[in-house]
């Protein structure tokens, strides 16, 4: 099948999109990607890029906007992107059997622009009104449209079983769960903490508020026995860079590929996934860091009452602390250094039995096999 993925970031990197595209390309589908480059203004640029071992046609449009700046500040760029989606689909309508829309900010335009016989898969990374700063006056309207699209889609994908609770008004024709779990791209041999003196903390992701980024930087700057390895991009990047310049135990990597991320995390001791539980969507979050910690066998620190924190607590594979007390998690795991090896073994077992990408990719391939079969009837 000819599949068009649409994403509201440049997919450079975007681990979930990359894995899904690679999986479908491997299964024999002809996949192309339309993505939003927010760094600068430019017309659509076409490149051929490798996703796994497979070449994919990628189209990126540049519409300058600011990550994590909120709905109001990015409204104009968002509207421009909606128009760009419509125009792109119209131009390539004969090359599309299925539109795979990632989140509401691509689903809105693509659903109402899709060719009549085109199938529609709605991949809900984050439930929009619970995740983004949508003005109160618009939330009801946005949720109604979102629900309509879910109900009319050929399939809806969510990233954890818990997310079903968010789809409170919708009744999708088909609903499947694909966890944000990584493929095994690097050696996963457990690295003993005795191989280096400092406790190495790893974080790679969006550098924005609501994730205890600056709080972690401050803690590490004041505690020489720890070392923070941090990568990513976002609104807090200048402040993170400043911490790194002023503290030799904070190392900033900037934007990293997914393979680089996993490799760096594998050289560290502890992963963190702090999300502010006051944000409704964070209660259902499925952080990449959770799955990466399982696959790599690294103890994980999470905030209480956020997605997957109960799994960490139940299986004793890290530390779960109040969001306002990240330092408690660091000190708790430092004191439990002797338990890290056992935690690692439990994590890898969980990954293999419940969350492996092999299992997730089988679900995705089966979905598209079924769509293809129903198309040929």
Question: Locations of the language-model features?
Answer:
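Nucleotide-sugar donor phosphate/pyrophosphate-binding loop at the beta->alpha transition
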Residues: 76-80, 118-121, 129-148, 184-187, ...
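Donor nucleotide-sugar binding/catalytic pocket of nucleotide-sugar-dependent glycosyltransferases
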Residues: 35, 129, 143-189, 196, ...
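Nucleotide-sugar-dependent
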Residues: 11, 15, 211, 257-265, ...
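A short, well-ordered alpha-helix in the C-terminal region of glycosyltransferases
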Residues: 332, 339-354, 363-366
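Conserved donor-binding/catalytic core segment of Leloir-type glycosyltransferases
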Residues: 2-4, 157, 193-221, 228-229, ...
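Nucleotide-activated donor-binding/catalytic signature segment of Leloir-type glycosyltransferases, i.e.
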Residues: 238-265
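Membrane-proximal helix-turn-helix segments that form the acceptor-binding/catalytic region
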Residues: 83-90, 108, 112-116, 122, ...
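N-terminal strand-loop element at the rim of the active site
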Residues: 4-12, 26-76, 163-168, 177, ...
């Amino acid at each position: 099948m000819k599949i068009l993925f649409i994403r509201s970031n440049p997919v450079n990197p975007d681990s979930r999109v990359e894995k899904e595209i690679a999986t479908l390309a491997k299964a024999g589908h002809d996949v192309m990607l339309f993505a939003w480059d927010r760094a600068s203004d430019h017309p659509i640029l076409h490149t051929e890029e490798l996703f796994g071992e497979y070449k994919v046609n990628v189209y990126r449009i540049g519409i300058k906007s600011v990550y994590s700046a909120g709905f109001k500040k990015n409204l104009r760029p968002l509207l421009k992107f909606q128009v760009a989606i419509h125009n792109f689909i119209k131009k390539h309508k004969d090359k599309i059997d299925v539109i795979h829309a990632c989140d509401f900010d691509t689903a809105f335009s693509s659903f109402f622009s899709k060719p009549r016989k085109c199938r529609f898969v709605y991949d809900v990374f984050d439930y929009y009104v619970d995740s983004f700063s949508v003005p109160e006056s618009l939330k009801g309207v946005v949720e109604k449209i979102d629900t309509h699209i879910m109900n009319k889609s050929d399939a809806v994908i969510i990233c954890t079983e818990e997310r079903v609770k968010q789809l409170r008004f919708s009744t999708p024709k088909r609903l499947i769960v694909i966890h944000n779990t990584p493929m095994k791209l690097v050696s996963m041999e457990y690295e003993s903490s005795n191989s280096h003196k400092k406790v190495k903390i790893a974080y790679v992701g969006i550098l924005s508020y609501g994730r205890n980024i600056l709080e972690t930087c401050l803690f590490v700057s004041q505690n020489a026995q720890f070392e923070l390895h941090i990568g990513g991009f976002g609104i807090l990047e200048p402040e993170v860079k400043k911490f790194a310049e002023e503290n030799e135990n904070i190392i900033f990597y900037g934007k990293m590929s997914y393979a680089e991320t996993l490799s760096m995390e594998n050289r560290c001791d502890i992963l963190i996934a702090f999300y502010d539980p006051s944000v409704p969507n964070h209660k259902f979050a499925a952080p990449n860091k959770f799955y990466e910690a399982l696959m790599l066998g690294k103890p994980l620190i999470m905030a209480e009452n956020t997605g997957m924190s109960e799994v960490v607590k139940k299986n004793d594979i890290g530390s779960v602390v109040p969001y306002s007390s990240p330092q408690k998690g660091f000190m708790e795991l430092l004191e439990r250094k002797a338990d890290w090896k056992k935690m690692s073994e439990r994590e890898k077992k969980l990954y293999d039995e419940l969350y492996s990408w092999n299992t997730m990719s089988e679900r995705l391939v089966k979905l598209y096999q079924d769509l293809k079969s129903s198309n040929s009837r």
